[in-house]
Amino acid sequence: MAEDLLKVEGLKQYYPASSGLFGKKTYVKAVDDVDFEVKKGEVFGIVGESGCGKSTLGKAICKLIEPTDGKIILDGEDIRGYDSKKMRSVRKKVQMVFQDPYASLNPRMSIHDILAEPLVIHGLAKGKQEIDEAVVRLLREVGMDDYHARRYPHEFSGGQRQRIGIARALAERPQLIIA
């Protein structure tokens, strides 16, 4: 039996709402007491209507937002208390493909630079030739051509931008992709 890659226990993400009558604080419960496990090699889906907390759940798992409560256990370690330095090693293992392809890519960077950035930051490719080859490989993995590397995000359709976001997530060869 495959071991757990990710285990989420009692995860909560509450946001303060306006104070009620007599100053009583109220909260919007975006994610409320969620439990699940993802085994290594498993594809796992969370389905729900718009606004039900799927994206918030993904951001909390990646610690892009700090959960209100619960455990996020990745490879047997609870990462909830990790500081930004410890999270760097986690981000090599876990990547997120953001929902909005228009907002998730820096408009001032070429696609080459967007895809090269995680490779350089995490030392996955060194030297211009190795970086260029890795960028081309990533573009091809998502069905795009080499020449797209020289273009900028505004030159692509929403679907193409989404594929660029996927390529960026794949750059670090993560164990878990949240999309």
Locate each region found by the language model.
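Conserved ABC ATPase "signature" region
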Residues: 78, 129-147
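Conserved ABC transporter NBD signature motif
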Residues: 70-78, 90
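Conserved catalytic motifs of ABC-family nucleotide-binding domains
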Residues: 173
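Hydrophobic anchor residue at the start of the ABC signature
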Residues: 166
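Conserved ABC ATPase signature
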Residues: 152-156, 160
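Helix-to-loop junction immediately C-terminal to a conserved catalytic motif
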Residues: 62
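The feature captures the beta-strand-to-loop junction immediately N-terminal to the Walker
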Residues: 47-48
